[in-house]
A protein has these predicted regions:
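Active-site-proximal mixed secondary-structure blocks
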Residues: 1-119
């Protein structure tokens, strides 16, 4: 898996398609303790002259506490060929155990962007 940094202001991106149909991964935590979850909802826009992604996460989700205890989280977008991996990330909770090995087997590798884990 290779990473490609894209500038959303230059990308022809349909947020309804990318978020609602292709899904995204929300990832929070730090290098040693992180979790990722699939989301098919969210909002992209501009607030106070800053580009934003707004996500609503239930307090019962394992990722919620990691988002609350860290200043940032990442949003990763994928093509349809990663559907199996995203489906797994949306159905298996990090509360149940470390799901990161299975995530790797499915072709997703975590990387750090600054202090934030991302896929």
């Amino acid at each position: 898996m290779s990473f490609e940094k894209i500038t959303l202001t230059e990308e022809n991106l349909n947020p309804f398609e990318k978020i609602g149909k292709d899904w995204v991964l929300l990832t929070a935590g730090d290098e040693n303790n992180y979790n990722t979850m699939t989301a098919s909802w969210g909002t992209m826009g501009v607030m106070w002259n800053k580009n934003i992604f707004m996500a609503v996460v239930r307090p019962s989700r394992f990722t919620y506490s990691l988002m609350e205890n860290n200043d940032t989280f990442s949003v990763s977008m994928f093509g349809k060929n990663y559907r199996e991996a995203l489906s797994f990330c949306g159905s298996y909770s990090g509360k149940e155990g470390d799901k990161n090995e299975k995530v790797k087997e499915l072709g997703l590798n975590m990387t750090m962007i600054g202090d934030t884990p991302a896929f």
